[in-house]
Amino acid sequence: MSCIFAFSKDRPPALIHDGYSETIDRKALQSYLRGACLLDPFYSACVNGHAEGLWRMRDLAPDAFYESEFAWSSEVHPCISDQAGTLIEEIGYIVPLGLGEAATFSLMRNRNSSPFSVEEFTNLEVLAPIVSASIQQHYNAINTARGGGKQHRSNADAVFSKAFGELTQAQYAVTKLILSGHSNISIASILEIAEGTVKMHRYNIYKRLNISSQAELFQLFIEQLTD
């Protein structure tokens, strides 16, 4: 399977190539576009100016990403909703589009296949300049239909804010990192605070939201996507 998304902090995500199989749950895809994409390592890479080229998701993902609810959720992760089951690997080309926007061209294999070998990855990596130029040309051709260079505030952050807007600024930042798949140690490093402070924030987040687990935290987010 394959897909191409255009991501920006200031515009809604756009699916500009739909190479998903017919078994993909379209509701999961809509939930992904409405806001779950915020938790995708490729989204984070695109909106934070990551180096272009071909990347394995595991090299972009936070340290606890594959233990996170998003990584295995059939409700918001289109690939996991496929009848073939859990992804075995995802790789993707990151392509800068200008004006703070970038595209990711994802190539995916499910558990009925094997991961991309070193040789396969190397061969695909050689094609990166051609892929990048082709996507940039295609995007420029369709960009006018999306409003050109105009800024349209993404609803993805609005959905996240709706779910967790009652939290303090510090708690909000920690919540976003938790759901993105960062461990307490990783969060402490990113926010430059002590690990014990992260644990205290997590405790207060759960208490304020009247929940007791990370799974419940994720479910609160999901409920906003399906409203």
Task: Please annotate each region the language model reported.
Residues I178-H182, F221:
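Short helix-to-turn junction characteristic of helix-turn-helix DNA-binding domains
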Residues R109-L124:
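Regulatory loop-to-helix N-cap segments in sensory/regulatory domains
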Residues G181-E216:
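Recognition helix of helix-turn-helix DNA-binding domains
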Residues Y172-A173, E216:
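Pre-recognition alpha-helix immediately N-terminal to the DNA-recognition helix
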Residues M1-G98, L107-N110, P129:
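Regulatory input/activation interfaces that engage signals or partners
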Residues Q214-T226:
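Short, basic, alpha-helical segments at the C-terminal edge of helix-turn-helix-like DNA-binding modules
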